[in-house]
Curated annotation (Swiss-Prot):
The keyword Transport belongs to this UniProt entry's keyword annotation: yes
Protein function: Acts as a component of the peripheral membrane COG complex that is involved in intra-Golgi protein trafficking. COG is located at the cis-Golgi, and regulates tethering of retrograde intra-Golgi vesicles and possibly a number of other membrane trafficking events.
Localization in the cell: Golgi apparatus membrane
GO biological process, one term: intra-Golgi vesicle-mediated transport
Record Pfam families: COG6_C, COG6_N
Name of this chain's protein: Conserved oligomeric Golgi complex subunit 6
């Protein structure tokens, strides 16, 4: 077995000695060794089978060699036990230990499948030549030497490959060694140089520290001086900008800085030497005051020349002036007052020029008399154009860009704009009021006054929408113009009615034809179309005009009836004349929506006069039929026209001397002679009433009342005289009077 221990065992024996079993720590790989190679069992069986065959062959062919080896082994065992036990035991342990370590390192080393496959392939090749290796002769010795040489070559090759892997590392380590030596020598030089320089740097550091401390003090002083100068003083250029520079963005920037300096100087008053703060504040205040006055002058100059507002840069600068002056109300109010005064004077002069020379080549006075509506319309149109133009101009002055001011400032300037517009336009209030009221006061035509009123109302609405804030200005003036027109209308109508009231010719118009007087027709023909065209009820808010239009004409013709020849007319004719006048008034005012309440009043008066005429007509029927005395007697006992009727109530009539059969027969004769033509007589007496409805109503009601009395009186006669003296029934009487249907419906 010298092929196994060729590198460790150097025995002088010819044959190898048997060795005891090795104790190998190969538990890890040996347990999984069979699982890695599925054909390990078959390989083992083949090897065992081959060994058996070899042993059999050797036992057959060479029994002598086997016997020799067996005897030799036994003798060696005995010698080992007896003679060399003490000497061989340590050496054997060493060999066993070395072999165990090698085998365990080999077997426990984790190998890949390919490496294991290669190992076992080499082992298989070795096992194939196992027979020649085990031969005891020269051939076996040569085979074993060959195997030993192959193993050595393999081992050398493997070791050489392993050493080749470390060769680059060794080369790098040698190069690194050179670099490390150079670095070590350089570091030693640096350390020596640093040690030499350290001593000299301490002196240098102390000097640098002193210089740095001085530099810090100088820098602090410089910063303090710079901060003081920036916070409490203005440089020469900034002072020049405030005193002599143009109004621009730079000017307002410097002005804001000057105001900030003025505020900051207040802290200087608290130091020991307060003169510095006082002088600084006085100088800065003087600069700020001059700059503010300069801003005010620029704003006044720009607002005084509206053509300059066409330049956007100038407008933007003006807006900056407004923003600056917003925090100084006395300056801003001064600018606005100057602007309002200038614009007010200009507008008043232009209006007076327009009013005095409106039409070239004609007399303004004559035109005002001929066509006052046109004159007032032109003046109001001119004023409206002035309002629109002035509103747009002032709105353009106070309209800021989106990013120039905040929302609060924009709202504040919007209020200032509306206030300026109101104040400027307020200057037109007095001249406009004087001129228009002068024209209205001279006008006496109702149609013209109504046209002026409508025109003034229209422009009042337009001015109210255009002017946001008025302060008793132009809008109030137009409103007063509307009121003046209303008052003038009422006064004119009242004067006209007064003239009619006192007119003798109007009284003479009441004649025997019982028709309404002509002045009523003329009056309503003039005034009602004007009322019909009125779309607002402001003119009727106090009902004075309505009362004059309806109530006073009624009062006037009633007064005329009392004072004229009509007072000698019969009562029926007076009532007919009243009905005709009221019917005419009703027909005139009914289409006018604003006179709806008066329509109800006139209807009530017509009903009142109609009832009087019905009573007159009933009295006439009773008188013609001889029933007047009996009618009075019955009504003295109990009113005959009540809905409740009982014959027993009228028993006291029997005590009256007139209630006799002879008198009743005479009444019956008169009735039979009168009633057949009574309807024609009634219609003839009411022929002069203009309204057929009123005539029909009077005839119907009077006939029904007469028929009702006749029927009830007939019952009284039948009850207490016991003889039917009245030939006709109440139904027949109603038929003769043409009201049978209405009478029976009432029953």
């Amino acid at each position: 077995m010298d092929f196994v221990d060729f590198d460790t065992l150097n025995l002088s024996d010819d044959l190898p000695q048997p060795q005891r079993a090795l104790s190998l720590p190969i538990a890890t790989n040996i347990e999984t060794f069979g699982r890695k190679f599925y054909n390990l069992n078959s390989l083992t069986r083949n090897l065992l089978k081959r060994d058996n065959n070899t042993d059999t062959e050797k036992s057959e062919n060479q029994p002598q060699v086997a016997e020799k080896y067996a005897n030799l082994s036994l003798s060696l065992i005995e010698d080992t036990k007896n003679a060399d036990n003490d000497h061989q035991e340590p050496h054997s342990d060493i060999k066993i230990s070395a072999l165990s370590a090698r085998l365990s390192r080999v077997l426990n080393n984790p190998l890949s499948d390919s490496q294991i496959r290669q190992i076992f392939g080499s082992l298989e090749d070795t096992l194939r030549s196992w027979d020649s290796i085990l031969e005891p002769g020269a051939l076996g010795s040569m085979s074993r030497r060959k195997l030993r040489g192959e193993i050595e070559r393999t081992l050398i090759r493997n070791q050489t490959q392993t050493l080749k892997e470390y060769q680059p590392v060794i080369k790098n380590l040698r190069k690194l060694e050179e670099n490390v030596d150079a670095l070590r020598s350089a570091s030693m030089g640096v350390v020596d140089s640093v040690n030499n320089d350290f001593e000299s740097s301490e002196i240098f550091n102390s000097k640098m520290e002193n210089l740095h401390r001085k530099k810090t003090a100088v820098v602090v002083k410089k910063q303090l001086l710079s901060a003081f100068r920036a916070k409490f003083t203005l440089n020469e250029y900034e002072e020049y900008t405030l005193e002599n520079g143009d109004i621009s963005d730079e000017f307002f920037t410097v002005l804001a800085k000057a105001e900030q300096v003025d505020q900051n100087c207040s802290i200087l008053l608290s130091i020991d030497n307060s003169q510095l703060g006082v002088k600084t504040m006085a100088r800065v205040n003087r600069l700020v005051t001059r700059a503010s006055e300069k801003v005010v002058a620029y704003a006044n100059r720009t607002l005084g020349n509206l053509y300059a507002l066409n330049n956007r840069d100038r407008v933007r600068t003006l807006h900056q002036c407004f923003v600056y002056l917003r925090h100084r109300p006395h300056y801003l109010n001064s600018v606005l007052a100057t602007f309002v005064g200038s614009r007010s004077k200009t507008l008043v002069d232009e209006f007076l020029g327009q009013a005095n020379s409106r039409v070239a080549g004609s007399s303004p006075q004559s035109e005002e008399y001929q066509d006052p509506v046109r004159v007032i319309g032109d003046l109001l149109a001119y004023i409206h154009s002035v309002v629109v133009s002035e509103s747009e101009t002032i709105s353009g002055i106070f309209s800021f860009e989106n990013d120039s001011v905040d929302e609060t400032s924009r709202k504040e300037f919007g209020e200032i704009m509306n206030d300026c517009v109101a104040k400027v336009l307020q200057s037109l209030a007095k001249p406009v009021r004087a001129k228009l009221e002068q024209i209205i006061s001279r006008e006496v035509r109702i149609s013209v006054l109504f046209s002026i009123h409508h025109l003034a109302e229209l422009y009042y609405i337009m001015f109210s929408k255009q002017i946001k804030q008025d302060h008793m200005g132009l809008v109030a003036t137009i409103e007063s113009l509307v009121e003046s027109a209303e008052l003038r209308i009422v006064t004119t109508v009242e004067n006209k009615l007064t003239t009619i009231r006192n007119s003798n010719s109007a009284q003479l118009q009441l004649n025997i034809d019982l028709q309404p007087p002509e002045w009523i027709i003329d009056f309503y023909s003039e005034i009602l179309p004007m009322l019909d065209q009125t779309h607002t009820e402001s003119i009727f808010k106090d009902n004075s005009l309505v009362n004059m239009v309806v109530d006073q004409p009624i009062q006037i013709y009633e007064q005329h009836m009392e004072n004229s020849q009509v007072k000698n007319f019969e009562k029926r004719d007076k009532y007919i004349l009243q009905l005709n006048c009221l019917d005419l008034i009703l027909s005139k005012i009914m289409p006018i929506s604003v006179l709806t309440d008066k329509v109800i009043l006139v209807n009530e008066k017509i009903k009142e006069v109609s009832d009087k005429l019905v009573e007159t007509q009933v009295s006439s029927l009773l008188e013609e039929s001889g029933l007047t005395d009996f009618y009075n007697i019955v009504n003295m006992i109990c009113p005959i026209n009540d809905d409740f009727f009982d014959v027993s109530i009228y028993e006291p009539i029997t005590e009256n001397k007139l209630f006799t059969e002879d008198n009743i027969r005479q009444v019956n004769s008169k009735i039979q002679a009168f009633l057949p033509t009574a309807l024609l007589d009634i219609q003839q007496s009411l022929f002069k009433i203009n309204s057929p409805l009123v005539v029909n109503e009077i005839i119907t009601e009077s006939a029904i009342k007469y028929s009702r009395f006749y029927g009830r009186f007939q019952l009284i006669c039948d009850e207490y005289l016991k003889v039917p003296l009245l030939a006709w029934s109440d139904g027949e009487v109603a038929t003769l009077l043409g009201v049978e249907d209405a009478y029976f419906d009432e029953q």
